[in-house]
């Protein structure tokens, strides 16, 4: 089951990032996280920025609304997405 927690100002979403992929895409679920493949390498925060940009673009939000709360140096991250509800996140990623 996906870790997706609704808060009063947005949602917390657990993601599993696979860097250096062929293209940016959602790859389904990995345990309780949304698996995201990204072309960016895991160097100097590039994959983190690509993750923020990909999630923001998928939800039609500015990247400033997406913040990595934990897991900055890990493939598994918890991301806070401001200004959306859990249902919009589920629809955007086909969950």
UniProtKB/Swiss-Prot annotation:
Gene3D superfamilies: YggU-like. Pfam families: DUF167. GO terms for cellular component: cytoplasm. Coiled coil: none annotated. It comes from the Bacteria. PANTHER family: UPF0235 PROTEIN C15ORF40. Belongs to the UPF0235 family. HAMAP family: UPF0235. This is UPF0235 protein PTH_1821. It comes from Pelotomaculum thermopropionicum (strain DSM 13744 / JCM 10971 / SI).
């Amino acid at each position: 089951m996906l870790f997706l927690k609704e808060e009063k100002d947005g949602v917390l979403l657990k993601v599993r990032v696979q860097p250096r992929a062929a293209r940016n895409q959602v790859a389904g679920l990995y345990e309780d996280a949304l698996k995201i493949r990204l072309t960016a390498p895991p160097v100097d925060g590039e994959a983190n920025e690509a993750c923020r940009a990909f999630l923001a673009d998928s939800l039609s939000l500015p990247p400033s609304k997406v913040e990595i709360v934990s897991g900055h140096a890990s493939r598994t991250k918890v991301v806070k997405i401001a200004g959306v509800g859990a249902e919009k996140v589920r629809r955007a990623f086909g969950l």
